């Protein structure tokens, strides 16, 4: 891929990605952020035009750029300083909010608007005006980068242009450090402070702004230091306006090929992508995208995407639950009711799992190993100890289930009754009752139920009547 196509493609994508954050901050009236994004948009657009015109081998014979380059070189000077000023203004506002030592002006108040405009635009506009004094030529044209400032290599260039980038980047770094200190000091009250100061920020928005400012400072501060040092190394001679603005060379358009794009293009692209990643992917921005798509009758796209996400989510959750359940399944070696369970044992899977005859194919067997006779005697003792238990069982709606809860009074953990009694109680208190239950349930274990109780009571009444009869 050539430099031309790379620059045009990356800058065009940056312009598209900067549109949503610009719309959002315009809605929230965040003036420093609006100015910052505007600078980045302007620089990306100029990079697209310059790369499209002056990137080919015949760039020397292309348009000389009169009019266009006169404007662009001023915007370049303003953007290099204006980005640092806007970021510093954002951090200054965050510091003011966190300090909470005075009442904050309303976002729509002229005091707030004027202060933000002065901090963000005064220095860039001033340097844009003074840059005319520093120009040796009207402008120059570099391959790939297009219009470029050609400034006088004297001390006045350092004073009127280069040092301001470093100053504002340094001020921004200092305020960023102060914000971190105040944030740590008041970390427990930050949420309340943001709410009570009428700042229009919540904790998430505050964190995004702070992270963004730190990243931009980490980019701009080294860049400003590098530019300042490089400028100092080139300082020579004395400045005179007459020699700098010589009428014989002023209108000469210098065209040169640096061999590759100058690094400031990549800085603009990088910062543009950072703006989108931090401000363009938040919940507020996503809600704005949704609202916009529905306003242009494209809401069905969101609905399709939502259904797709929900479907995949359910599928992933199902797979996860299956994996978890397969790990937790284990066979109880003390289970004896093999008739009631299906064996899911396979040759490649061990241990096998006994499951009830149901769609779920899961069971939990709470019974513990014990002497069957002793367990049955204990069960018999507590089951028929008094009539209160029977009364409780009568009040329980068992519907058609054979397995009923069994409630006893005063049972302790020393009682060795089967824990499976919470779902079913196997009883064998008499051989006759056992045989009767076995015939009724066709080989299954006898389960105590109201039906069996009624049958027993009716049989007892019938036998007593026979005994009492003549």
UniProtKB/Swiss-Prot annotation:
Extracellular side, ranges: 1-5, 54-70, 135-155, 229-266
UniProt xrefs under InterPro entries: GPCR_STE3
Spans within the Cytoplasmic topological domain: 24-29, 99-116, 184-205, 286-470
Region (Hydrophilic) residue spans: 300-470
UniProt region (Disordered), positions on chain: 440-470
Keywords, sorted A to Z: G-protein coupled receptor, Membrane, Pheromone response, Receptor, Transducer, Transmembrane, Transmembrane helix
Biological processes per GO annotation: cytogamy; pheromone-dependent signal transduction involved in conjugation with cellular fusion
Topological category with respect to the lipid bilayer: Multi-pass membrane protein
GO molecular function terms listed in the Swiss-Prot or TrEMBL record: mating-type a-factor pheromone receptor activity; mating-type factor pheromone receptor activity
Record field: transmembrane: 6-23, 30-53, 71-98, 117-134, 156-183, 206-228, 267-285
Protein family per UniProt: Belongs to the G-protein coupled receptor 4 family.
Name the UniProt record assigns to this protein: Pheromone a factor receptor
Organism of this sequence: Saccharomyces cerevisiae (strain ATCC 204508 / S288c)
Lineage: Eukaryota, Fungi, Dikarya, Ascomycota, Saccharomycotina
């Amino acid at each position: 891929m050539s430099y031309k196509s790379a620059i045009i493609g990356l800058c065009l994508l940056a312009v598209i990605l900067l549109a949503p954050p610009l719309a959002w901050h315009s809605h929230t009236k965040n003036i420093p952020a609006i100015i910052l994004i505007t600078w980045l948009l302007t620089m990306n657009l100029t990079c697209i035009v310059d790369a499209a015109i002056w990137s080919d081998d015949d760039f020397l014979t292309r348009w000389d750029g009169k009019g266009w380059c006169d404007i662009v070189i001023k915007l370049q000077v303003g953007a290099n300083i204006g980005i640092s000023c806007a970021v510093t203004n954002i951090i200054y506002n965050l510091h003011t909010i966190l300090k909470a030592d005075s009442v904050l002006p309303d976002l729509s108040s002229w005091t707030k608007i004027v202060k933000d405009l002065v901090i963000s635009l005064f220095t860039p506009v001033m340097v844009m005006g003074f840059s005319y004094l520093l120009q040796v030529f009207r402008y120059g044209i570099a391959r790939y980068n297009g219009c470029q400032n050609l400034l006088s290599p004297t001390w006045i260039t350092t004073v009127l242009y280069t040092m301001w980038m470093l100053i504002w980047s340094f001020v921004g770094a200092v305020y960023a450090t102060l914000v971190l200190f105040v944030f740590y000091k008041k970390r427990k009250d930050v949420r309340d402070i943001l709410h009570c100061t009428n700042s229009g920020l919540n904790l998430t928005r505050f964190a995004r702004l702070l992270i963004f400012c730190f990243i931009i400072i980490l980019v701009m501060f080294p860049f400003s230091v590098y530019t300042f040092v490089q400028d100092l190394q080139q300082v020579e001679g004395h400045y005179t306006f007459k020699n700098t603005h010589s009428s014989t060379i002023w209108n000469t358009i210098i065209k040169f090929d640096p061999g590759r794009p100058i690094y400031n293009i990549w800085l603009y692209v990088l910062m543009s992508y950072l703006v989108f990643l931090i401000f363009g992917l938040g919940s507020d921005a996503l809600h704005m995208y949704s609202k916009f798509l529905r306003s242009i009758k494209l809401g069905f796209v969101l609905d399709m995407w939502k259904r797709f996400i929900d479907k995949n989510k359910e599928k992933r959750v199902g797979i996860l639950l299956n994996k978890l359940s397969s790990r937790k399944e284990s066979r109880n070696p003390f289970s004896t009711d093999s008739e009631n369970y299906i064996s899911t044992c396979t040759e490649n899977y061990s241990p096998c799992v006994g499951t009830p005859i149901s769609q779920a194919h899961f069971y939990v067997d709470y019974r513990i190993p014990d002497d069957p006779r002793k367990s049955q005697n204990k069960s018999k003792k507590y089951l028929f100890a008094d009539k209160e238990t029977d009364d409780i069982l009568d009040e329980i709606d068992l519907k058609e289930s054979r397995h009923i809860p069994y409630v006893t009074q005063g049972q302790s953990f020393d009682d060795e009754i089967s824990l499976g009694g919470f779902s079913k109680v196997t009883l064998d208190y008499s051989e006759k009752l056992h045989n009767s239950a076995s015939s009724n349930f066709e080989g299954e274990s006898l389960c105590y139920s109201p039906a069996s109780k009624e049958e027993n009571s009716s049989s007892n009444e019938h036998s007593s009547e026979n005994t009492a009869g003549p």
